[in-house]
From Swiss-Prot:
Pfam families associated with the record: HD (PF01966), KH_1 (PF00013), RNase_Y_N (PF12072)
Gene3D superfamilies referenced in this protein's UniProt entry, alphabetically: Hypothetical protein af1432, K Homology domain, type 1
Encoding gene per record: rny
Tree of life domain: Bacteria
Membrane-spanning intervals of the chain: 4-24
Taxonomic source organism: Lactobacillus acidophilus (strain ATCC 700396 / NCK56 / N2 / NCFM)
EC number: 3.1.-.-
Record lineage: Bacteria, Bacillati, Bacillota, Bacilli, Lactobacillales
Membrane topology: Single-pass membrane protein
Subcellular location: Cell membrane
Name this protein carries in UniProt: Ribonuclease Y
InterPro entries linked: HD/PDEase_dom (IPR003607), HD_domain (IPR006674), HDIG_dom (IPR006675), KH_dom (IPR004087), KH_dom_type_1 (IPR004088), KH_dom_type_1_sf (IPR036612), Ribonuclease_Y (IPR017705), RNase_Y_N (IPR022711)
Length: 543
C-alpha cells in the first residue's frame, strides 16, 4: 500500500521536476532570446548612430573643404587683382617714363641743334671779326702808304725846286729844258720805287696764297649747280594671260588681301591688259612684292600659304641683293675694310630715293667727285671718297629710326668706328655743325654738284613719302603693334597686332587712338582709313 501510494507521489514529484526544468529551460530560452533581441537592437542603434556620426562628419568635412576652396578662390582672386593692378601700375609707370624720356630726348636734341647753331654763328662771327680785323689792318697800311707817298712827293717837289734852281744857275738853261731834265730824272726814281713796292706786294700776296688757295677753289666749286632723273612709286608685273588676274584675286579676294597684308604694298588690278600694278612708297617693300608676284605667276599655284612662302623667299633674295649692292659700291670706289653691317646699310640705299633721286647712285657720284677734287688739291683722296660715299648713309634707315638722316648717319659711323673726318663730313654736309676739314667742304660741294641738276628732284614726291612714313610711325608707336603699312596712296593704314597682347575689344580702342593722333599731328587731303587686323594662327602637325 505504501508502495502504491509512493508511486504516484514519485510520479508527481518527477513530473513536477520535469515541468520545473522544462519551464526553466523554456523561460531561459525566452530570456536569452530577449537578450539577443536587445543586443541586436542595441547593435542596430549603435550602427545607426555611427552612420549618422560619419555622415555628420562627412558633411562637416565637405563644408570645411568648401570653405577652404572659397577662401583659396578669394585669395587667388585677390592675388590676381593685386598682380593685375601692379602690372597696370608698371605699364603706366613705364609708359610715363617712356614719354618723359622721349620728351627729354627731344629737348636734348633741340638743345644740341641750338648749341650747334650757336657754335656755327660764333664761328661765323669769329670769321667776320677776323675779316674786319684784316680790313682794318689793310686800311691802316694804306693810310701809312699814303702818308709815306705824300711825304715822298713833298720831298720830290722840294728836290725839283732845288735842282731847277741849280740848273738855272749852272747851265743857264731855259725853264722848259730844265723842267724836262728834272722830270726825266724824277721819272726814273719813281719807276724804281714803284717796282720795289710792287715786288714787296707780290711777296706778301704769295705768302698768303698758300693759305687761301684751297678755300678760294672750294668756294668756286660750291657755286656750281646739279641733279638726276626721278623715280616712280609703282612697279608693273607682266601676266601671261588675262585668266591669271582671276587666280591672283582668288576666292572673294582672299589672295589680294593676303598679299597686301604680307607685303604692305597695294596690288592694283584694272582693265590694263596682261599687267598688274604694285603701288607703294617703300622701294624695298615694292621690290619684294614684285619678285614674289613674278614667282607666283611663274609657279601658277596662288593661295595664301603659297603667297607667304614666296614673299619670304623674295625678302631673303632682296636682302642678299642689298648686301651685294653695298659691296659693289665699295669695289667701284676702291674702298676697303668697312664693317659688314655698314655695308648692308649702304646697300639699302639702292632702294631709296631722295626727292626722286636714287640715293646709292647719288652717294657713289658724290664719292667720285669728292675724291677727284681732293686729288687736285693735294688732300687725302681715299678719305674724301669714303666721306662722300657715306654722307647720306642715314637715309637708309631714317624711316625706322627717329631723327634726321644726318643724326642717324653720324651715330652709325661712330658706332662702326669710321674716321673722325668722315663723321664730321656727314654731320656738317647740311650746315648743322662747323666743318672741321677741307674734306668736309669738298663733300658739301660734291653733294651740291650731284644733287642740284635741274629736273632731277621732285619736292612733291618727297613730301608724299614723308607723309606715308609719318603715318606708319604713328601706328607703330603703340604697344602690341607688330607691323603697319600705309597703302592706297596714304588713304588707308593697315595695322597688324600681336593677338596675345591685343584683344578684340582693344583693337577698337587702338583704331580710335591712332585715328585721333593722326588727326592731331598730320595734315592730309580727304580721309584716312585705319584698319586694325588681329589674326591668331594655330598650326597642328599630324604624323
Amino acid at each position: 500500500m505504501n508502495t502504491i501510494i509512493m508511486i504516484p507521489v514519485a510520479t508527481a514529484i518527477v513530473s513536477l521536476l520535469v515541468g520545473t526544468v522544462t519551464g526553466y529551460a523554456i523561460r531561459k530560452h525566452s530570456w536569452e532570446q530577449k537578450a539577443q533581441n536587445a543586443q541586436n537592437d542595441a547593435d542596430h542603434i549603435l550602427a545607426d548612430a555611427k552612420a549618422q556620426v560619419a555622415a555628420a562628419e562627412a558633411e562637416v568635412n565637405a563644408q570645411k573643404q568648401a570653405a577652404i576652396a572659397v577662401k583659396q578662390s578669394a585669395e587667388n582672386t585677390k592675388k590676381e587683382k593685386i598682380l593685375e593692378a601692379q602690372e597696370q601700375i608698371r605699364d603706366y609707370r613705364q609708359k610715363t617714363e617712356d614719354e618723359l624720356n622721349s620728351k627729354k630726348d627731344n629737348l636734348a636734341r633741340q638743345e644740341n641743334r641750338l648749341q650747334q647753331r650757336e657754335d656755327t654763328l660764333d664761328h661765323k662771327n669769329s670769321l667776320l671779326d677776323e675779316r674786319e680785323a684784316g680790313l682794318t689792318e689793310k686800311e691802316d697800311q694804306l693810310k701809312q702808304q699814303n702818308a709815306s707817298l705824300k711825304a715822298k712827293l713833298d720831298e720830290a717837289d722840294e728836290l725839283v725846286g732845288i735842282r731847277r734852281q741849280k740848273l738855272y744857275d749852272v747851265a743857264k738853261l731855259d725853264k722848259d729844258q730844265a723842267k724836262k731834265i728834272v722830270l726825266d730824272q724824277l721819272s726814273d726814281e719813281l719807276v724804281k720805287e714803284r717796282a720795289e713796292m710792287i715786288r714787296n706786294s707780290n711777296e706778301e700776296v704769295m705768302a698768303k696764297a698758300d693759305r687761301y688757295a684751297n678755300q678760294v677753289i672750294i668756294d668756286a666749286i660750291q657755286s656750281s649747280a646739279a641733279d638726276t632723273v626721278a623715280e616712280t612709286t609703282v612697279s608693273v608685273v607682266d601676266l601671261p594671260n588675262e585668266e591669271m588676274k582671276g587666280r591672283i584675286i582668288g576666292r572673294e579676294g582672299r589672295n589680294i588681301r593676303s598679299f597686301e597684308a604680307l607685303t604692305g604694298i597695294d596690288l592694283i588690278i584694272d582693265d590694263t591688259p596682261k599687267v598688274v600694278t604694285l603701288s607703294g612708297f617703300d622701294p624695298i617693300r615694292r621690290e619684294i612684292a614684285k619678285r614674289a608676284m613674278e614667282r607666283l605667276i611663274k609657279d601658277g599655284r596662288i593661295h595664301p600659304a603659297r603667297i607667304e612662302e614666296m614673299v619670304d623667299k623674295a625678302r631673303k633674295e632682296v636682302n642678299d641683293d642689298i648686301y651685294e649692292a653695298g659691296e659693289s659700291a665699295l669695289m667701284e670706289l676702291g674702298i676697303h675694310r668697312m664693317n659688314p653691317e655698314l655695308v648692308k646699310t649702304l646697300g639699302r640705299l639702292k632702294y631709296h630715293t631722295s626727292y626722286g633721286q636714287n640715293v646709292l647712285s647719288h652717294s657713289i657720284e658724290v664719292g667720285k667727285l669728292a675724291g677727284t677734287m681732293a686729288a687736285e688739291l693735294g688732300l687725302d683722296e681715299k678719305l674724301a671718297v669714303r666721306a662722300g660715299l657715306l654722307h647720306d648713309i642715314g637715309k637708309a634707315i631714317d624711316h625706322d629710326i627717329e631723327g634726321s638722316h644726318v643724326e642717324i648717319g653720324v651715330e652709325l659711323t661712330r658706332k662702326y668706328h669710321e674716321p673722325d673726318v668722315v663723321v664730321n663730313a656727314i654731320a656738317a654736309h647740311h650746315g648743322d655743325v662747323p666743318k672741321l676739314s677741307f674734306i668736309a667742304e669738298l663733300v658739301v660741294a660734291a653733294d651740291t654738284i650731284s644733287s642740284a641738276r635741274p629736273g632731277a628732284r621732285s619736292e612733291s614726291l618727297e613730301n608724299y613719302i614723308r607723309r606715308l612714313t609719318d603715318l606708319e610711325k604713328i601706328a607703330k608707336s603703340y604697344q602690341g603693334v607688330k607691323q603697319a603699312y600705309a597703302i592706297q596712296a596714304g588713304r588707308e593704314v593697315r595695322v597688324m597686332v600681336e593677338p596675345d597682347e591685343i584683344s578684340d575689344d582693344r583693337t577698337v580702342i587702338l583704331a580710335r587712338d591712332i585715328r585721333n593722333q593722326v588727326e592731331k599731328e598730320l595734315d592730309y587731303p580727304g580721309n584716312i582709313k585705319i584698319t586694325v587686323i588681329r589674326e591668331k594662327r594655330v598650326v597642328a602637325i599630324a604624323k
